[in-house]
């Protein structure tokens, strides 16, 4: 990536004028199309999040702890989209004002301190919350008795841990790093933080992959446990709680897996682009970077999945309750007939 070098902060400050490739990419029609495309995705996220939050609040089918975690995950996704929207609007205005001046079309990195900080923080926080959702399902499976009584406390603890870890990662990545130099957009990290930034991105990829694998494992164990309960336990409450655990884990597995898919897409696409960078113009490189931002797609998928999976859970829950009610009635009548036959 041409804009990142091994230069010192003092040397980066002298590079006021951007390269011809970056200048062309900023003024490209494809960059303007990307603005429209991203704005549509972000406003769609806001609209669908309203619907998802309403169904979560009014028709909750999850434990209180899972509900809280899903709400916070939804809130963080919207905050990340909101700050991304602000960054992109600033970017668009900046391009229009400075479209003819290659020495003004880039942002001085200190100008991006606040919005880039919030954007980076909420991006890492989304991974922390996905991990929290995974551990929520893990606790529900292996500490079910304690979890049922303390699911809210468990959620608050997991959220607190997510925030603390995110703060530590953020300080480790950006703490004490000079914001010298110029960047095409405020989504770009400070140039002198690139090495640590890449390490963190790679770590996030593997963490989400681990979350995905663990959630699938918990889901399979839940399904296995549910089948055993159906065969050997006839207490309606126990059977229903087992069914609820499977439903909730399926929903959360969908969210985690989808985030992994989008991050994988973003990471793989970026790796391919960097491999081909030598034979690619700088203009094309920087335009492509704008289209492979997995975060904006992942954020959109969260309200979509919460809304669809919650409604699906409501329908399955209703069918299960009807089935269990009918089954209970059949068992009761069968036992009554056996008692009558025994007495006679």
Swiss-Prot record:
<keyword id="KW-0812">Transmembrane</keyword>
<comment type="similarity">
    <text>Belongs to the nematode receptor-like protein sra family.</text>
</comment>
<feature type="transmembrane region" description="Helical">
    <location>
        <begin position="67"/>
        <end position="87"/>
    </location>
</feature>
<dbReference type="GO" id="GO:0004930">
    <property type="term" value="F:G protein-coupled receptor activity"/>
</dbReference>
<dbReference type="InterPro" id="IPR000276">
    <property type="entry name" value="GPCR_Rhodpsn"/>
</dbReference>
<feature type="transmembrane region" description="Helical">
    <location>
        <begin position="203"/>
        <end position="223"/>
    </location>
</feature>
<dbReference type="GO" id="GO:0007606">
    <property type="term" value="P:sensory perception of chemical stimulus"/>
</dbReference>
<keyword id="KW-1133">Transmembrane helix</keyword>
<dbReference type="Pfam" id="PF02117">
    <property type="entry name" value="7TM_GPCR_Sra"/>
</dbReference>
<feature type="transmembrane region" description="Helical">
    <location>
        <begin position="157"/>
        <end position="177"/>
    </location>
</feature>
<feature type="transmembrane region" description="Helical">
    <location>
        <begin position="28"/>
        <end position="48"/>
    </location>
</feature>
<dbReference type="InterPro" id="IPR000344">
    <property type="entry name" value="7TM_GPCR_serpentine_rcpt_Sra"/>
</dbReference>
<feature type="transmembrane region" description="Helical">
    <location>
        <begin position="287"/>
        <end position="307"/>
    </location>
</feature>
<keyword id="KW-0472">Membrane</keyword>
<protein>
    <recommendedName>
        <fullName>Serpentine receptor class alpha-27</fullName>
    </recommendedName>
</protein>
<feature type="transmembrane region" description="Helical">
    <location>
        <begin position="128"/>
        <end position="148"/>
    </location>
</feature>
<dbReference type="GO" id="GO:0016020">
    <property type="term" value="C:membrane"/>
</dbReference>
<feature type="transmembrane region" description="Helical">
    <location>
        <begin position="252"/>
        <end position="272"/>
    </location>
</feature>
């Amino acid at each position: 990536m041409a804009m990142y070098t091994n230069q010192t902060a003092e040397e980066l400050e002298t590079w006021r004028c951007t390269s011809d490739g970056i200048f062309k990419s900023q003024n490209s029609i494809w960059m303007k199309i990307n603005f429209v495309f991203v704005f549509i995705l972000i406003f769609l996220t806001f609209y669908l999040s309203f619907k998802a939050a309403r169904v979560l609040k009014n028709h909750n089918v999850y434990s209180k702890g899972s509900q809280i975690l899903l709400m916070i995950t939804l809130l963080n996704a919207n905050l990340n989209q909101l700050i991304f929207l602000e960054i992109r609007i600033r970017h668009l205005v900046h391009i229009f004002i400075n479209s003819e001046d290659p020495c003004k079309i880039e942002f001085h990195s200190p100008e991006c301190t606040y919005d880039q900080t919030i954007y980076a923080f909420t991006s890492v926080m989304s991974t922390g919350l996905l991990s929290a959702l995974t551990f929520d399902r893990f606790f529900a499976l292996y500490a079910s008795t304690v979890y049922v009584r303390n699911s809210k406390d468990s959620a608050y603890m997991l959220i607190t841990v997510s925030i603390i870890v995110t703060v530590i990662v953020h300080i480790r990545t950006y703490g004490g790093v000079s914001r010298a130099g110029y960047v095409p957009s405020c989504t770009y990290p400070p140039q002198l933080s690139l090495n640590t930034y890449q390490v963190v991105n790679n770590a996030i990829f593997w963490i989400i992959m681990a979350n995905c694998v663990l959630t699938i494992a918990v889901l399979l164990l839940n399904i296995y446990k549910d089948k055993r309960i159906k065969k050997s336990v006839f207490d309606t409450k126990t059977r229903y709680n087992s069914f609820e655990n499977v439903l909730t884990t399926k929903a959360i597995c969908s969210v985690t897996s989808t985030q992994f898919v989008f991050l994988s897409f973003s990471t793989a696409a970026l790796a391919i682009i960097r491999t081909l960078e030598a034979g690619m113009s700088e203009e094309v490189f920087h335009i492509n970077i704008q289209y492979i931002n997995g975060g904006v797609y992942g954020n959109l998928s969260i309200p979509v999945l919460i809304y669809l999976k919650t409604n699906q859970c409501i329908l399955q829950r209703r069918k299960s309750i009807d089935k269990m009610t009918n089954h209970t009635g059949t068992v009761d009548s069968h036992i009554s007939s056996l008692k009558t036959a025994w007495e006679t």
